[in-house]
Amino acid sequence: MLFRSDDLLTTEEIERLVKLFAKEGGVRKVRLTGGEPTVRKDLTDIVERISRIDGIEHVAMTTNGVALKSKLDALKRNGLKSINVSLDSLVKAKFEFMTRRDGLEKVLKSIDEAIRIGIETVKVNVVVVRGQNDDELLDFVQFAKEKPVNVRFIEYMPFNGNKWETRKMVSYAEMFDTIQKKYPSIARIPDETKSEVGKNFQIDDFQGTVSFVTSMTNHFCGGCNRLRILADGNLKVCLFGNAEVSLRDAMRVDNASDDDLKAIVEGAVKRKKAKHAGMENLAFMENRSMIRIGG
């Protein structure tokens, strides 16, 4: 079990925090991650409440996609605009080995359904690990050729529990070189904002696009404007940092006012470091596993 149910933020607590961030912090986009958001019975209600908050322009979600298909229509009707589906293999046996479940077909059907009903943006997150799925790099590129999706290749990052090793990390430069040899027309798409996380590329005659998230070899800390509220209500100002502060406890135990919460958040942001540690230091830093942080 990732979290006890009593530890999770309630629907009302989530709504309160998003209202505060929108009003006081100028937040315009909210992404629901996890653990896995589709396991929450109140997910559609959460999306509906967030999408109605003044100032919120975009509600997105990151999911493993296994239980997504049947929920998509209601989520879209209630304000969900984009999804990221985490998918590290297109090979059935390998998918089962990596995820410990038989769900590849369900994930692929969820992606197709999202496209069919007109979800604005459909992204596929692929964490590339040497010796595990790096041989599927071009298969995922082909996926972007055949479908109007953005396939995002993510450099393998050090987190608790993933047995990270430098040699397992396939760099952006290496991935790009492999793809460019097969598709020489690959060309950079200009960033829409300074806070863009991925380096985005288009290829001639492709329905979709490909991107690279280069957290390890070419960090984007200087343009990062993201804050994370974890499922249990802890605030993280940096994905790779291990400093957290509990907004849930501030609300439940300390009966914090909105001004109190604002002060807590501002204090955490002021303590944020200019950039995250290097790969080797991160590998030995105590931090949550990625599944507990959310993608």
What do these predicted ranges mean?
Residues 1-2:
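Short, small-residue-biased leader/transition segments that mark boundaries at the very start
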Residues 145-146, 156-159, 163-295:
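Auxiliary Fe-S-binding modules of radical SAM enzymes
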Residues 8-11, 15-31, 40-154:
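Radical SAM/AdoMet-radical enzyme domain recognition
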